[in-house]
A protein has these predicted regions:
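Long, low-complexity, Ser/Thr/Gly/Pro-rich intrinsically disordered segments that act as flexible linkers
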Residues: 1-145
């Protein structure tokens, strides 16, 4: 027996390769939340722009195709910085809570790709979230950013 997925609760970048849907422009932002309340307020404002996995056609003139897509991913330290309750944080699998550095040998990040060679931004849990914006053209990308 299979379950029906609630596509509204799944971010679009999980199910769609935006490049093949006509979004050749992209910008990636790394975020840090220094104040939990301000971070949560930022996310409350951002949520209206998050692209879900709900169906839309790839055709350029599709009426429900968004002009831009926006998605976000969090690190464990990012969820901690947002003051997510410990009870909730404990529910995440160790693969996520350990982080990429602790799992580098499993991920193939060895030799020149090992954690000690990563850019400084990746040291010490400083990245709390990754924001991706895809657009049909540069003007649309700049207007969303």
């Amino acid at each position: 027996m299979s379950k029906q997925l609630d596509l509204y609760d799944i971010q679009g970048n999980i199910c769609k390769g935006y490049g093949r849907y006509g979004y050749p422009k992209a910008r990636y932002c790394f975020l840090r939340f220094d104040d939990p309340k301000q971070g949560r307020l930022f996310l409350l404002d951002l949520i209206k722009d998050i692209t879900t996995a709900e169906a839309w056609e790839a055709k350029e003139d599709s009426p429900n195709k968004p002009p831009c897509t926006t998605n976000i991913g969090f690190t464990y330290s990012g969820l901690e910085a947002l003051a997510i309750p410990q009870r909730s944080l404990k529910g995440f699998p160790v693969d996520f809570t350990a982080g990429m550095k602790a799992r580098s040998h499993i991920l193939g990040d060895t030799g020149c790709n090992s954690p000690e060679n990563w850019d400084e931004i990746w040291h010490g849990g400083r990245v709390h979230a990754w924001l991706s914006i895809y657009a049909r053209d540069s003007n649309m990308l700049e207007s969303r950013f």
